[in-house]
Amino acid sequence: GSATSLSYYNKPLLLTYSGGKDSDVCIELAKRAGIPYEVVHSHTTADAPETVHHVRQKFRQLELEGIHCNIVYPTYKGERVSMWSLIPKKLMPPTRIARYCCNVLKEASGRGRAIITGVRRAESVSRSSRGALETITAKKSDKVVFDLAPDDQERMYFDDNDAKRRWFEQCKMQGKISINPIIDWSDQDVWGYLRECHTEINPLYYCGFSRVGCVGCPMAGRRYRYQAFERYPKYRDMYLQAFARMLEAMVRAGKPATKWSTASDVFDWWMEDTNIDGQLRFEEEQTC
């Protein structure tokens, strides 16, 4: 992977860092391998405060070790955006099906680079059949798969963690080569390795989270999302404000909502979206 990055792009590997346990494993692996690498984090604007702090703390440590780190802030149509300003622009809430937030808030980093991700098959049932190598393109008809298992699906690097993720992937549309070194690791492998390395992890793992990600992510279960909003009520308020602006924008665009009258109506509908395993969720009990 490192040789490919240097020969193909003339740049070191770029490790995409989310602030979660899998990203921490990838950093430890890169350190131990002694390869040149850089680290990038996509600031989604909807991550929990603990995650934001953990990322910045990790980057300070890495910079002291001589590792170049960069935080990428999201833009849409040439303008800086947040989750809250993006929703009115899109005239709809982000859902499990319409995951525009992933594309705008997470997918911009790593263009024209060979990237390392912490994608794992064990993170969800749907990831279980990912293979070894694939080329990812904007059009399904242009896709080339270097694997025994056929596939015709498009990929989203940071959130499309379905069963067909590979160890090595190439995205022609975004100019990315994606390397997933822990694709076959189990949860036990991850936690065991982090303990062995004495790695400082995101404090949310000590507070009842089994995974970390955007607060309110529609890929999480309804019960867990409500628990997240109990912990972070200001995020709920920001979603409500964004939904209110969205309804106003829909009227201005000549597309008034038919199923919602208020921001609360939108929020209640949005929270009923059912769960897909593999994203932010809480355990049964919170400990802090």
Predicted regions located by residue number:
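Nucleotide-activated chemistry modules centered on ATP-dependent adenylation/adenylyltransferase
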Residues: 1-288
